[in-house]
Regions:
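Generic secondary-structure boundary/loop-capping signal
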Residues: 13-15, 39-42, 48-49, 53, ...
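SAM-dependent Rossmann-like transferase core, predominantly class I methyltransferases
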Residues: 42-68
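Residues at the start of alpha-helices and the adjacent loop-to-helix junctions
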Residues: 22, 29, 51, 76-77
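Conserved SAM/SAH cofactor-binding pocket of Class I
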Residues: 60-127
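Conserved short-loop catalytic and cofactor-binding motifs
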Residues: 21, 47-50, 98
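N-terminal auxiliary segments of SAM/dcSAM-dependent transferases
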Residues: 1-45
Length: 127
C-alpha cells in the first residue's frame, strides 16, 4: 500500500532505523488509518504515497531533530491519529510513548492501532 522504497531511502539518507518489520507495521498503520478514516475524520491525508511522505517520513525525521535518550518517555499531547508519536515509537521500541487526546473516538482508534501493531503505548483521554 505505502511506498516502502521511498521510506527506506529517506531513512537511509538520514541514518534512521528502518527494517522490514517497521515497513510492515507502517503499512498496517496506513491501512487502518484509511479504514477508520471512512468512519471518523482522523486525517485529510489518505492517499498511500501522501501518507508515506507527509505522515510517516515527517514523523520519522523527528528522530534526527531531537536527541531522544534510550528508554526515554515521550508524551504526544493532542496526538490525533498518532502522528508523530506512533511512527517514532515503532522505529524506537525502547521508548515509552504516551498518547493524549481529548476525543474518545481517537483514543479508541489509537488503542486498536497500538494493539494490532504491538506497540505498548499508553492512551489517555482527557478534557
Amino acid at each position: 500500500m505505502i511506498d516502502k522504497t521511498y521510506l527506506e531511502s529517506v531513512c537511509a539518507a538520514q541514518s534512521l532505523p528502518f527494517s522490514p518489520e517497521l515497513s510492515e507495521k507502517l503499512d498496517q498503520y496506513a491501512q487502518l488509518l484509511v479504514e477508520w478514516n471512512e468512519k471518523m475524520n482522523l486525517t485529510a491525508i489518505t492517499e498511500p504515497n501522501d501518507i508515506a511522505v507527509k505522515h510517516f517520513a515527517d514523523s520519522l525525521l523527528l528522530l534526527n531533530a531531537l536527541d531522544i535518550p534510550k528508554n526515554a518517555s515521550l508524551i504526544d499531547v493532542g496526538t490525533g491519529a498518532g502522528f508523530p508519536s506512533v511512527p517514532v515509537g515503532l522505529a524506537r521500541p525502547d521508548l515509552k510513548v504516551t498518547l493524549l487526546d481529548s476525543l474518545q473516538k481517537r483514543i479508541t482508534f489509537l488503542e486498536t492501532l497500538c494493539a494490532q501493531l504491538s506497540l505498548p503505548a499508553v492512551c489517555v483521554h482527557g478534557r
